[in-house]
């Protein structure tokens, strides 16, 4: 099939190029704008308790004041606030109120209750119109700028924090991160390609095709799918898409380019060489893309909206890239003369001895048992380190630098006031018998909630709805609302809230900590559902590719070890050496996405080469030698580019991207340089022909570089 695709693409190269350009423009112009959300509650299904509580709050207390932002006041000299300072703070809040800033509904003046115990800090809470669009940042920018202007000429320093300010800072941080990641990936890919091929055109061509055609097409299709299926996008998605498109697109380009150069060196005419390259590597690209796409698409089964959106989005990006890699890319390459393509290199036709990879192949050929034991033992050792993994749920502080103003405010509020005061939990008690709540039961219920371990205080008077059917008990926790300790408190708080609820009522616990506790539960569900389904589907794809029921098992086992080893190494680096309390809760999913899914690419490329060598009549150990000798440079180059691309995440300057960057770069390196280069060939050599059971049938031996009769017939068409 791929030979026929190659013939069509090469014969009608200009038609293929024009068709791609027209399709890219048409799809991009008609696509909707992709809006994103960073509100964690947006990513939970509606049946979780925290979401049900939020819905109840909106119904029972439609006029309730919910602060969207907060002004933090302090003296510039760090001293205690004076009477003059309090007057200046009133001037600031009154001035902002008088401006009637769009969507600002309420600005609460500073009072005695909003001043810290040490007298150095004061808070003014700000409420937005509930109908204000979440994507609106102009209101928050104006509030921040005008507050600083009004505080000018005083001894006060004023900063804006809260959810609205966090959203603004996350957006700014995300834009900066995207630019740094794109620039870093671009430069690294150009340098690595230039080093590999010594060619001006090859070093820049894949990036031009990705940026000009593949990326706009993918982004437009993702926007269409997101709107069509009502999915939620996240600011993290854009940075990940950049790296996936650049990294995976360049990887598939390398898969094709190495084979194309190999066939040219074997003496095939230019156009026939491209047909042969597509025919030989097309199946590997399609299978690799299929495995990655399935792994990504399975995330549609996730409980979390974040992964429901990012999985299909990445699947669309990979499918688009794979289709372009076997149509657009070969069409462009086939119209470029060989001298121009490889300029200024002059010795590209001469195959280098490849002594390093030949030596590695020879080592595996001679001692496959030792190679399998050492590489497998290394993976197992790192996997054991994953037992120390701990998750943390403070997504806001993890997704941007701690120097951002909203983060400074958050940390100051937690230290100057009660740690949980920045975002109290809410316990809603609502009548189930149609009668108004009995207020006489409130004191006992308040006392029961206050007795829960981890609770700092409970507001003495709950807020009662107008119809008297629902009461809101505000509960301040002892710990930071986003901390693991606060999330652990949720179990006890929910248990007490439910069991101590007065007769004829039911209780629901809401608030940010409750949302994060539910996210934790949803993640546990996803680990038990998504991972096994993805593993089974990837094994099916591997079985279809290899016509074997044996090889998929040890290939998936090696990928599983790669996942565990990556998580273990990341846990050691960030928890042990960087002294972090835990890794971001979503990190295991990201490791799964890229190490399991994309890491399978390199295993597929190597196992496909092993099968090809075996079909040419070589013994299992000889096949391992030839596969590493010829496939090793491709795997090493592709792995280096993708690992380097993900390493650029660490340029973003925030905890989440640093963890993602390190873990995925390390995992990709493991996949390429340990699993695909040593573990998989060594195991295949040890298993021998049993690895291909029952589908392997050995044809007549074909010497390396020898054309088959089919190749000769196809080549005749291009010798005019």
Feature annotation, model-predicted:
Residues 34, 68-69, 73:
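Short, conserved active-site loops that position catalytic residues or coordinate cofactors/metal ions
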């Amino acid at each position: 099939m791929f030979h026929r695709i190659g013939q069509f693409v090469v014969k009608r190269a200009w038609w293929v190029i024009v068709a791609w350009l027209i399709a890219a423009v048409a799809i991009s112009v008609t696509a909707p704008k992709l809006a994103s959300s960073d509100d964690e509650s947006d990513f939970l299904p509606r049946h979780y308790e925290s979401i049900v509580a939020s819905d109840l709050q909106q119904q029972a207390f439609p006029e309730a004041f919910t602060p969207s932002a907060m002004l933090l006041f302090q003296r510039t000299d760090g001293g205690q606030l004076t009477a003059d300072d309090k007057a200046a703070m009133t001037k600031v809040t009154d001035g902002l109120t008088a401006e009637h800033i769009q969507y600002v509904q309420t600005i609460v003046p500073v009072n005695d209750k909003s001043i810290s115990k040490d007298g150095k800090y004061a808070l003014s809470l700000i409420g937005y119109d509930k109908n204000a669009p979440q994507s609106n940042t102009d209101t928050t920018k104006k509030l921040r700028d005008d507050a600083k202007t009004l505080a000018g000429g005083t001894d006060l320093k004023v900063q804006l924090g809260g959810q609205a300010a966090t959203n603004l800072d996350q957006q700014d941080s995300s834009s900066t991160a995207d630019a740094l990641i794109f620039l870093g990936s671009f430069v690294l890919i150009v340098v690595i390609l230039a080093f590999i091929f010594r060619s001006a055109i090859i070093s820049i061509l894949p990036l031009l095709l990705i940026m000009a055609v593949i990326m706009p097409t993918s982004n437009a299709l993702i926007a269409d799918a997101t709107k069509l299926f009502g999915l939620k996008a996240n600011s993290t998605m854009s940075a990940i898409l950049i790296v996936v498109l650049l990294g995976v697109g360049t990887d598939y380009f390398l898969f094709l380019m190495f084979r194309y150069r190999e066939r040219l060196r074997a003496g095939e005419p230019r156009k026939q060489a491209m047909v042969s390259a597509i025919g030989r590597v097309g199946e590997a690209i399609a299978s690799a893309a299929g495995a990655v796409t399935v792994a990504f698409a399975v995330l549609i089964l996730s409980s979390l909206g974040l992964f429901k959106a990012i999985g299909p989005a990445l699947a669309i990006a990979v499918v688009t890239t794979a289709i372009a890699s076997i149509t657009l890319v070969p069409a462009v390459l086939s119209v470029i003369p060989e001298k121009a393509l490889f300029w200024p290199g002059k010795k590209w036709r001469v195959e280098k001895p490849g002594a390093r990879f030949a030596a590695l192949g020879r080592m595996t050929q001679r001692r496959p048992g030792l190679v399998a034991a050492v590489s497998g033992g290394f993976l197992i050792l790192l996997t054991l380190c994953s037992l120390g993994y701990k998750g943390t749920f403070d997504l806001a502080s993890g997704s941007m630098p701690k120097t951002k103003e909203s983060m400074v405010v958050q940390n100051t509020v937690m230290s100057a006031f009660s740690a949980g005061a920045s975002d109290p939990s809410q316990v809603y008690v609502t009548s189930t018998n149609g009668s108004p709540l009995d207020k006489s039961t409130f004191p006992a219920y308040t006392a029961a909630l206050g007795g829960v371990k981890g609770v700092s205080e409970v507001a003495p008077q709950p807020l009662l709805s107008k119809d008297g059917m629902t009461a809101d008990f505000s509960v301040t926790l002892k710990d930071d609302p986003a901390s693991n300790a606060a999330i652990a408190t949720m179990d006890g708080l929910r248990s007490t809230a439910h069991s101590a609820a007065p007769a004829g009522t039911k209780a629901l616990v809401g608030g940010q900590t409750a949302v994060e506790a539910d996210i934790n539960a949803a993640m546990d569900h996803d680990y038990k559902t998504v991972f096994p389904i993805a593993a089974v589907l990837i094994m099916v794809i591997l079985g279809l590719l290899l016509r074997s029921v044996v090889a998929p098992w040890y290939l998936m086992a090696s990928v599983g070890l790669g996942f565990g080893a990556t998580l273990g190494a990341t846990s050691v680096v960030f928890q042990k050496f960087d002294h972090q309390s835990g890794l971001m809760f979503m990190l295991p999913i990201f490791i799964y996405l890229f190490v399991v899914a994309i890491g399978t690419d390199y295993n597929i490329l190597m196992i496909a080469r092993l099968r090809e060598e075996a079909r040419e009549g070589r013994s299992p150990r000889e096949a391992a030698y030839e596969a590493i000798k010829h496939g090793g440079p491709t795997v090493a180059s592709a792995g280096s580019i993708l690992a380097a691309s993900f390493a650029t995440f660490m340029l973003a300057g925030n905890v989440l991207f640093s963890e993602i960057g390190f873990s995925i770069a390390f995992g990709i390196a493991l996949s390429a340089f340990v699993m695909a280069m040593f573990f998989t060939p060594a195991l295949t050599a040890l298993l021998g022909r049993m690895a291909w059971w029952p589908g392997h049938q050995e044809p007549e031996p074909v010497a390396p570089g020898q054309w088959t009769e089919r190749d000769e017939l196809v080549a005749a068409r291009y010798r005019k």
